[in-house]
């Protein structure tokens, strides 16, 4: 429950949560950023973690001196790349067993199908593009590994996608962090980013439940 409470506090009051990490020292601050980004992208059981909003919020704090922007980007790149690589390997070695177990409730047949279709449509480029879609960015590496994509091809697009995604959201927070409106309405902006990430999930769950009722 400790980790769940940790995430709940981050979502409830991101400004206070991140400020407390920074106050605890660089190891805690950068470590928390790395941990959340790595787990969201690397562990298929946690696709709901707030990766986009955390990167934006961290960039905001970097603008105000809480993080060193170069160090923050390096941490974000490392977490995103290593996370996807871990997810790929989990899918490669344990993918079918995990799906068959039914223990990953977020991995509904609809989401698996959507991720597979995304891979079929875009091929290797799906690894890059999938970074910008919540849930898909967690499931695509897993399914790519399970489906036998060559490791070398995956690595290339993983690195490109990880660097691009983490840089875009971090720098958005960094460059917009000095705007008075952003400073005054920081929490609302974070809630908005989280909402955009969660809405597709809620819609998917509703559709799945309605589908079961109609069967």
How should each PLM-predicted stretch be described?
Residues 34-51, 130, 197:
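Transmembrane alpha-helix interface/packing and boundary motifs in multi-pass membrane proteins
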Residues 166-178:
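Transmembrane alpha-helical segments of integral membrane proteins
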Residues 1-35, 60-142, 146-153, 178-193, ...:
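Membrane-interfacial helix-loop-helix
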Residues 53-61:
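Hydrophobic alpha-helical segments within and immediately flanking transmembrane helices
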Residues 79, 164-165:
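MFS transmembrane alpha-helix packing/gate-lining sites
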Residues 40, 164, 195-198, 202:
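Hydrophobic membrane-targeting signal helices
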Residues 23, 42-47, 127, 155-160:
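Short, amphipathic, aromatic/basic-enriched membrane-interface segments that mark the entry/exit
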